[in-house]
Amino acid sequence: MAVFIEKTLEGLKELLDERGQMKILGKEGTLNEVECQFFASATDQEITEFEKKLNVTLPEDYRVFLKTHNGARIYDVMIYGSNVGGGLHILSLKEIYESMQTIALLKPTFIPVAHLLDGCYLLIDKTKASTDPNYLWLLNQTEYEFLNLNFELFVDRYIVSQGANFWKWNLYSAENYYRTN
């Protein structure tokens, strides 16, 4: 499997100004100012210890991300120059441990790896992590939704769609879009 997540992240970084900010076009023509932050990489030892603690082999694309950045914030919303959060918060290994203790409805087969603006968590299915290329789920409050994606495809599409909930797009036809918005 060719892993391209580093290329996607480098492309995004090239679009950012010196403050890590940029303007993006949101749905229905909304112009938003956003900020991105990328944290220092995790070491091979930290990743291996994490895998041993959870008794899991992490997917290759997610391991590559961790070796590049042990966490990131993508498309945090800026209002009048102040970061008000939102966007995609890719958790560090430490934040994953903490989240596993605090997410009330988290099933033991899942590892939370990111948090989204609308209260959703992006999850790796431990039972599929080393055997199935489509191992990603979304936990939305109390409902689990299989995304039929891996980590790097999710991040790539999230960046290309400029932070939109792209996984819901196939649900909208012109007819039902205007009824719900």
PLM segments and residue spans:
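A short alpha->loop->secondary-structure connector
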Residues: T131
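A surface-exposed partner-binding patch
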Residues: M1-Y121, R179
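Non-cytosolic coordination micro-motifs
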Residues: F154, R179-N181
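A recognition module on extended beta-rich or small alphabeta surfaces enriched in W/G with H and D/E
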Residues: T127, Y135-N170
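Low-complexity, glycine/alanine/valine/leucine- and proline-rich hydrophobic stretches
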Residues: Y121-K128
